[in-house]
């Protein structure tokens, strides 16, 4: 399959399905993070999502093998974050990392294992969009929360564990989890979908 082909209607349908699956996994990661590590859920959310979403990402790349699929998924996620009250940076991070990840995957014709792993790592960092203002735009983030009716106790709890140490942990954990999740996703695609002739 040529990666230069334009996206067709069936391609867009496939992208929509995979984006919906990715959204479900982000939702699961959000609630799971809050249950596993209350107080640190925002810190570990990108890592947890990266760990469990590799199969969806790798299957999309293997099935489509065209530029645009990964980008569209990033854009859709960014639009969701923006319309749900997050900062504009949420949209910017997802769209930028989605497009960059798409270019990296295309450089290896969507077949290079290392290229796809790097692509997935970059895409996973797009989920920092909604939370990175907590570290670097604290006052604006708090003002946004107050405008949405959040009280002082809620805000204090939210920022209790936000510091540069937890930022470094979040970045490192996301890298490791994206590599593990992406590797696992590649194994599952090869074992179950390639052999079955689905991709």
Where does each model-flagged region fall?
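Short, charged juxtamembrane terminal tails flanking transmembrane helices
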Residues: 1-4, 189-199
């Amino acid at each position: 399959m040529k990666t230069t082909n334009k996206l067709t209607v069936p391609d867009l349908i496939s992208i929509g399905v995979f984006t919906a699956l990715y959204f479900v996994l982000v939702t699961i990661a959000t609630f799971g993070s809050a249950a596993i590590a209350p107080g640190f859920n925002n810190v570990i959310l990108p890592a947890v999502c990266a760990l469990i979403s590799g199969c969806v990402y790798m299957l999309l790349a293997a099935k489509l093998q065209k530029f645009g699929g990964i980008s569209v998924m990033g854009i859709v996620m960014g639009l969701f974050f923006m319309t749900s009250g997050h900062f504009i940076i949420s949209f910017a991070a997802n769209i930028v990392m989605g497009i960059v990840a798409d270019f990296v995957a295309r450089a290896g014709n969507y077949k290079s294992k290392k290229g796809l792993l790097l692509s997935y790592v970059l895409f996973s960092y797009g989920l920092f969009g909604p939370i990175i203002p907590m570290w670097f735009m604290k006052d604006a983030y708090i003002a946004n929360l107050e405008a949405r009716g959040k009280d002082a106790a809620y805000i204090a709890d939210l920022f209790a564990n936000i510091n540069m140490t937890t930022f470094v942990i979040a970045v490192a954990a996301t890298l490791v989890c994206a590599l593990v999740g992406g590797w696992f996703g590649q194994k599952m695609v090869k074992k179950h979908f390639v052999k079955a002739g689905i991709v």
